[in-house]
Amino acid sequence: MSKINKLEHIRNIGICAHIDAGKTTTTERILYYTGKSHKIGEVHEGGATMDWMEQEQERGITITSAATTCKWQDKVINIIDTPGHVDFTIEVERSLRVLDGAVAVFDGVAGVEPQSETVWRQADKYNVPRMCFVNKMDRMGADFYKCVDMIKDRLGAKSLILQLPIGIEENFKGIINLIKMKAVIWKDESLGAEYFEEDIPTDMQDKAAEYRARLLDMTVELDDTIMERYLSGEEITEEEIKILIRKGTIEAKFYPVLCGSAFKNKGVQPLLDAIVDFLPSPIDIGIVKGIEVSTSEEKDFPISITEPFSALAFKIMNDPFVGSLTFIRIYSGKITSGASVVNTVKNKREKIGRMLLMHANNREDIKEASAGDIVALAGLKDTSTGDTLSDIDTQVVLERMEFPEPVIELAVEPKSTADQEKMGLALSRLAAEDPSFKVSTDHETGQTVIKGMGELHLEIIIDRMRREFKVEANIGAPQVAYRETITTACEIDYTHKKQSGGAGQFARVKIIFEPLKDVIDLKDEDKNKTFVFESKIVGGAVPKEYIPGVEKGLNNIRETGIVAGYPMIDFKATLVDGAFHDVDSSVLAFEIAAKGAFREGMQKGNPKLLEPIMKVEVITPDEYMGDIIGDLNSRRGQIQSMDPRGNAQVVTAYVPLAEMFGYVNTLRSLSQGRAQFSMIFSHYDQVPSQVADIIKAKK
């Protein structure tokens, strides 16, 4: 391995696409033909090597990006197999951040599907060079040319066709290689391991010549000298064509398109050749952006084995045998097991325990790794996804990954109180693995609330809690965090007096209650508060030592409003006058008086129920705009803007959180899964009276 493990010989690639396009099957075939798997795993039999989690084998979908290393010709290929379900886009995003190139797999029947669009946009964000593999050419209804048109129309991508299919559907038997101008036919009886080249069938020669001319027209544009030779009728060599295709792919001038049927073992070896020939090595990427810790300056750092060590942690995974594994992509320098490095994001030293090369869920211990490698480290204590590991003497922080906010939440509780601690540990471990999964405690209900990217995402979290941590949980729908406020100002004069033998109680307070939005002279430090208390007592009408009792009483009682028992927010209470008794007054008496004044003030202040309003952004193809806007309006949404973004539309709206539960599924069905959305908390607003009546009735 070490002899050939030089930067120009490494290909760090991802295989990504929509669910069911055949990514995992394609990866399985790659592992088979590169000699890593002795038998081919079939997804529909639950035996694929890459799909190593139990849930994945049951569902036949890829949930976590398994990393694996294999070898083709004299090149090392590190493959990340990514999930295709929309709930797991974070896994795709994490992978793309550390890859140099990607293979986008398309279903030859369905063409460009919704998740294909999402993944393509994510790859654009990280400027990842990529090629396309039109899979399932043996299936009924497969149409290579239609799929290529969809790549152009839906993704706005300039495709460079390198192969044409020979035969369609069940008669698909091979491809035409437009670079060599030869037909490649696979022998079925050898599981696709054997294939032979022959002349292009007579009935396809004209079409092959037409597409070969297109290929040359697009590639020679990249080199003026070769273009002049081409225009003067000179023959361009196969090697020159390959160099131009590589240049155009790395610069994203176009995207090479290949075809085949991974399941039927046709087209995989030419795909491997293309990965090696056209996708970039770490040297082609050249630099990585980061910040030099000593100067706080942003710089471009060269990707090189001779530079000081730097790496990005892009995934944390719990391994049943090794414990916590941190997957890293090394950008510069080298590292040995047992070495000490620094986590520059957390400013903590880490000691490398075991260092592993991963093959799905099998592992191989290694002693050293260097720039370009993707390896798993055991024994790290403080490193989380997105952190930088760096040389202790020359510290850098690499560009961080961005993670979307979760959009769906559920309340969970253990089925037995004995499991409470175990559940807390399980959830914190799972949250450490997955930045798009968050855990919080609702301070009002005491419930543990889990948040994720979709219902399937949370289902799998709960399933993993049960299988890996042996914690059974009850799940429920979370409650919306309603609030209450007053809408008009009022002045309350309240006296608390108690005389019934023994020490008496006496306190009088005069308090002005007013909505915060109406306060003209609000101090800067109070502008982000939901409750403000001020004392304007002069002349000792209420002694200084009793005033904290007034504030404490108001703070305690405002947790339970009078409309439906929700906390009161967005109001100011000003203590303007009062009276006390030398013997009977106390802090407690003024606390009780303040509570009495609050109850009266809230009644007179025209109280209203408030609800959280979310800022919702929907990205959708044009054709679904009408349905999506109609649906948002029916959810009491207020449309703020509609703007074009690339070949999609972005709708921004403010929608009550109570109306957004289950929206992810509605949006999928409205847009056939092609639209995506994000939402963040914006503000609290009044609940319409007819809705408020329903909420009060439920309390």
From Swiss-Prot:
Location in the cell: Cytoplasm
GO cellular component, one term: cytoplasm
Chief location of this protein within or outside the cell: cytoplasm
Residues in tr-type G domain copies: 8-283
Keywords of this entry: Cytoplasm, Elongation factor, GTP-binding, Nucleotide-binding, Protein biosynthesis
Recorded GO MF terms: GTP binding; GTPase activity; translation elongation factor activity
Domain of life of the source: Bacteria
SMART domains: EFG_C, EFG_IV
InterPro entries assigned to the protein according to its UniProt record, in alphabetical order: EF-G-like_DII, EFG_II, EFG_III, EFG_III/V, EFG_IV, EFG_V, EFG_V-like, G_TR_CS
GO annotation (BP), single: ribosome disassembly
Entry-linked Pfam families: EF-G_D2, EFG_C, EFG_III, EFG_IV, GTP_EFTU
Residues that bind GTP: 17-24, 81-85, 135-138
Record family assignment: Belongs to the TRAFAC class translation factor GTPase superfamily. Classic translation factor GTPase family. EF-G/EF-2 subfamily.
PANTHER family in the record: RIBOSOME-RELEASING FACTOR 2, MITOCHONDRIAL (PTHR43261:SF1), TRANSLATION ELONGATION FACTOR G-RELATED (PTHR43261)
Its biological purpose: Catalyzes the GTP-dependent ribosomal translocation step during translation elongation. During this step, the ribosome changes from the pre-translocational (PRE) to the post-translocational (POST) state as the newly formed A-site-bound peptidyl-tRNA and P-site-bound deacylated tRNA move to the P and E sites, respectively. Catalyzes the coordinated movement of the two tRNA molecules, the mRNA and conformational changes in the ribosome.
Protein known as: Elongation factor G
